[in-house]
Amino acid sequence: KIRVTNITRSAFSGLARAENVATLPWETIRSLQCSTLGESCGMLRFEPELEKFAQSEPGWMRQLAQVIPAGSRVFLGNSLPIREMNLALQTTKPGVEFFANRGANGIDGLVSTFLGTSASHRGECWLIVGDLSTLYDLAAPWIIAQMDHPKLRIVVINNGGGKIFSRVNSLRALPEPARAVIENRHSLSFEPWAQMWGLEYVQTDDVHDLVDLLPVPIVIEIKPDPMQTETFWRDWQKPVIRPR
């Protein structure tokens, strides 16, 4: 088999096999030449940007990764959550496991799948999912009352629609009404959803509210700052100026 050297911010190599794979710590990348790194060099350059734009979507992913405790099981939603966590994650705490799932239509059934993966884990279980993915699976929490699991944390990143489509170049030139339809824009709150299933609820713009949560299932609604998000991605797309 082909030998692979993997430089990662976590212990996960991203490969299905362990043979002929050397996994090196993320810090190794600092000793390499930027000219050979491409996007990875840009990731290092944007660590300060993630901190500066802490209320942006990628900034929130970085903050969430910092407060999720060791030994947790984390389920990442499709579309932007998994991409932004992959970008923003600096390191993982001991024993943190990551899961993801691709529904038949992409984002369907994610809350249900999260609850299924949580059933066998007695530590904290975190779902980080987009608003449209949540709307596709509103009935999922019916099973929570039968699970006897006090540490379920459902984080809904509510950016008012499918914002991944706003980053598709071919769609940017469309008329505004067409873009609104494609993005499925809305102004919904997920508090009534939490109330319907008897779950605790908090909407926050301060990650410190998520430290030492009560041992009860809870819906956490986060509304990222759209201007910070747009500025972050605009800076991200700027070319990396490499030293000669």
Residue positions per predicted region:
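Structural motif
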Residues: K1, N6-S10, F53-A54, L76-L80, ...
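Glycine-rich, acidic loop regions that bind phosphate or pyrophosphate groups
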Residues: K1-M43, I144, N169
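A structural signal for isolated positions on well-ordered beta-strands in alpha/beta enzyme cores
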Residues: R3-T5, R73-F75, W126, R153-I154
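Short, charged/polar "capping" segments at the starts of alpha-helices
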Residues: S10-R17, R83-M85, G162-F165, T229
